Regions:
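Blade-level signature of beta-propeller repeat domains, shared across WD40, Kelch, NHL, RCC1
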Residues: 388-420
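Bacterial N-terminal signal peptides
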Residues: 1-9
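Acidic carboxylate motifs that coordinate Ca2+ or other divalent cations, activating on Asp/Glu
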Residues: 63, 67, 113, 117, ...
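Beta-propeller blade termini
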Residues: 53-62, 103-112, 152-162, 218-227, ...
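Beta-strand-rich domains and repeat architectures in extracellular enzymes and scaffolds
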Residues: 43-71
Length: 420
């Protein structure tokens, strides 16, 4: 009997009348993937109820192989060491034993000692964590070097003030719990400059270098969006219009959100930036949900905002992206077919119901027009409540592999077939 997989309906793809309750459940014949092998069963520690919210691929022990650091919501963050060929082994208590509401993770050599360090952000308990790596797979808790807490749910790392050191940008939400640090407004973004006099220690520049307003941020991305040589910021929000902050080169940001053509209300959970149209200018992708697993509310259609070449962004989603009604808490940009054009992997969850669906793959034709290539690219077993994704060459074959996070479903590892 031919196996089947879940896919968007032909009707929804065509953009005709859509039924959010049923569109995601049409069945199509499954063909073997020509791009990825789902190696979860043999390469990833089994944890089907874990809330794997994000991951980064980084060599923590200097053996030349990428390891994986995973943020865990309502749990303890995890370190998976790469034992070779992308097989991951769980190293318990690498980041302590305390359970937190961890949302995202990023890595950088913050103290310039040649070893990679790791920062996690937490939402409901409001306490972020910084761990300094020793280059041998061990970490020391240095969270006291972070100058403030918040209810964090967006995280990015990069040199924001031009001094050559990686800084930290944290987007915050407005949840209220007794444990949260209320010394500062809950939902304002945080900007931590790496102290040039003491690399790996941080100075809070939020009050002097950021617009002072309440926000509700679930996603953050850094990129040079106005082509002036410094990193700007895009903030993704589930309740407010998404925002663009432009950098003056010294880490002072001004609101330039009027450059974003936001044509419909969105509940955005993640944002990515890449040159998707091949014109040399960076474009913006917003991954959206209809609601946080409540009733049908906003249109969850993924949105593509195309750079017009001057740092202004037009919404061209209708003519460039497949139409869909599933909700997407996350996705990633990756050239999965090796043609030199960035493609998209798109997480899919049916809401209402919070039903796990198959990961989607959208192929770029090179001009920023995308077609659904799920049946060809994604193995039929790659199903879950897909959350934020890490990527890199785990098995050393020259292809890009992807770890798909899972909220209460098994995180799944896709190994690329590209250069095997």
């Amino acid at each position: 009997m031919m196996a089947v997989l879940l896919a968007p309906s032909t009707l929804a793809q065509a953009g005709d009348a859509r039924n959010p309750a049923t569109d995601a459940f049409d069945l199509v014949e499954e063909a073997p993937s020509s791009v990825f092998v789902d190696a979860t069963a043999t390469h990833v520690p089994t944890a089907p109820s874990l809330h794997s919210t994000d991951s980064v691929f980084v060599d923590v022990n200097g053996d030349g192989r990428l390891d994986v650091v995973v943020s865990v919501e309502h749990g303890v963050n995890r370190l998976y060491l790469n034992e070779g060929a992308g097989r991951l082994a769980y190293m318990p208590d690498a980041f302590g034993t305390q359970r937190r509401d961890n949302e995202h993770v990023r890595a950088a050599d913050f103290d310039r000692d040649g070893a990679m360090d790791v920062v996690f952000i937490s939402e409901s308990d409001g306490e972020h964590q910084l761990f300094m790596g020793n280059g041998k797979g061990g970490f020391i808790d240095a969270s006291d070097r972070l100058p403030a807490g918040s209810q964090g749910n967006g995280l990015a790392v990069g040199d924001l003030n031009g001094d050559g050191l990686p800084d930290i940008f944290i987007g915050s939400t407005n949840e209220s719990t007794p444990q949260a640090d209320m010394a500062a407004p809950r939902s304002r973004s945080l900007l931590f400059f790496n102290d040039a006099a003491r690399p790996g220690h941080f100075i809070d520049a939020s009050g002097t270098h950021l617009p002072q307003r309440e926000e509700h941020t679930e996603g953050v991305v850094l990129a040079d969006l106005d082509d002036d040589g410094d990193l700007d910021v895009v903030l993704a929000s589930p309740t407010h219009p998404n925002r663009l902050l432009l950098n003056d080169g010294q880490g002072r940001f001004t609101d330039a959100s009027d450059r974003l053509e936001l044509t419909v209300p969105m509940e955005t959970r993640e944002v990515h930036v890449a040159d998707l149209t091949g014109d040399g200018h960076l474009d913006i992708v917003f991954f959206n949900i209809t609601s946080n697993n409540a009733a049908w509310d906003k249109d969850p259609q993924t949105r593509l905002l195309v750079n017009d070449g001057t740092g202004h962004f037009r919404d061209e989603s209708a003519q460039r992206l497949p139409s869909h009604t599933f909700s997407s808490w996350a996705g990633t940009v990756v050239d999965f077919d090796g043609d030199g054009h960035p493609d998209l992997l798109v997480g899919a969850i049916q809401v209402p119901g919070f039903v796990p669906l198959q990961l989607r793959a959208w192929r770029n034709d090179g001009t920023g027009h995308f077609s659904d290539a799920t049946a060809e690219v994604v193995p039929g077993i790659t199903v879950g409540r897909s959350w934020s994704m890490g990527q890199g060459d785990l098995d050393g074959d020259g292809g890009t592999d992807v770890l798909v996070g899972g909220w209460g479903t098994q995180a799944r590892l896709l190994l690329s077939k590209g250069r095997r």
